[in-house]
């Protein structure tokens, strides 16, 4: 598919909505399918929001033992303003009961790293310098 096709443009726009960054260059079959089909069609299907689709994906990742991918989605959700620290922690507790405690424990480690980054960013935004006494 050409780089200027409507489907490619939709795929790129959806990737930006999901992850918060632009994909400038699409090269290779796997990336083309990812942009054109997954994000250009699958993420367009129906009327669900990005947040709703993301929550489904997080649940699926947890059920499949892909805590790292779930963590990536949670981090993107925070950066996109869809979830806050309380939401992240609630998701871990909820999924622990369905995906299992060991999987949730792994996800919780990812969540606490994200929450720490959020707190550090808030401190910097507020003018607090963690290096000053």
Regions found by a protein language model. Name each.
Residues 1-51, 74, 79, 103-133:
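Acidic, glycine/proline-rich low-complexity segments that act as flexible tails and inter-domain linkers
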Residues 83-108:
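Charged/polar, low-hydrophobicity segments characteristic of intrinsically disordered regions
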Residues 52-61, 91-92:
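Short, structured motif recognition centered on aromatic/hydrophobic residues
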Residues 59-65, 95-99:
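Generic structural signal for hydrophobic core residues of well-folded globular domains
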Residues 64-71, 101-105:
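Short helix-capping/linker segments at secondary-structure and domain boundaries
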Residues 66-89:
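Mid-chain, well-packed structural core segment of small domains
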